[in-house]
Amino acid sequence: SIKMKPILKLSLLALFFSISLLARSIDDIKASGEIVIAVYEDFPPYSFMEDGVPKGIDIELGKKVANSLNVKPIWYFTGSDENLADDLRNTIWRGNLVHKTKADVMFRIPYDYDYLRMTNESTGELENEMVTIKGPYQSEKWIIATNKEIIPQIKTLAIFAYQTIGVEVDTLPDLHLSGFARGLIQKNVKHYTKFQEAINDFKNGKIDAIAGLKSQIEYLIDYKNNKDKYYLTQDIPQIKSQWDLATAVSSNYRDLSYHIDGLIDTAYKNNEIKEIFENFGVEYIAPISKTQ
């Protein structure tokens, strides 16, 4: 999938220039016959390329959106910026700086009250006033996976004063574990620029544990078929335990946002979303906002 990235981006650019460069209303989308759907690149099991074909949980959900409008999905694979506000600006309301394209909808956006009310420190304006965030479709959380033979269970993070744990750099687990108990376990926190590299070392026994997103860990270690080999925690102590993920649409086109919200709600109630997750070997956690 990594080798496909440059080719993929070039082909996507060609497609982008053949369609509208603006985020659009439902009528505009139907008239064009295409909907531009933004997903994060190289991010299994959510969105990734496999043998030149887009795959993933968010890809399947995006197909549902496209099918509901009877249009073709155009995939806009995007990297993650320094923060979510930048991601939303570059994909939804301002557009990419290079090719100016705006996506009609973006997946995997935190549906979190604190974020929805977050303001820009310099302007005092809402960070997300240019987008509307609706359609929560799953709940995600940070967890730790261990090799059962080495660490059969975790009662305290202090165990990593003696055992090694891998993290992706600059993630919340990295910051939390590195600073735990004033650096007590810092020497055993192994940093990786790519999470897949941490997974590889974990599976090969080079490190004893990994910390990351539950869905991603379950998929990458094939936990469903290896429950005898690995132990998963329910959370990471003292880290925000759980949050919902949803979709973002330009606030100029709330009709599209409400349409997607209704579509996802129906798919949730029909267990279609749960089935998508299970097809990728991931245990589905329903959105907090739909279970309270």
What are these language model-derived features?
Residues 24-112:
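Extracytoplasmic small-molecule ligand-binding "clamshell" domains
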Residues 75-157:
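Acidic, polar ligand-binding/catalytic clefts
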Residues 62-68, 148-151, 162-164, 241-280:
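Extended ligand-binding regions for polar small-molecule ligands
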Residues 86, 109-123, 176-180, 203, ...:
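A ligand-binding cleft/hinge motif common to bilobed small-molecule-binding domains
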Residues 41, 138-143, 214-261, 283-292:
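Periplasmic-binding protein-like
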Residues 5-13:
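Sec-dependent signal peptide recognition
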Residues 63, 67-72, 135-138, 156-159, ...:
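Ligand-binding cleft/hinge of the Venus flytrap
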Residues 65, 92, 144, 160, ...:
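Hydrophobic residues within well-ordered alpha-helices
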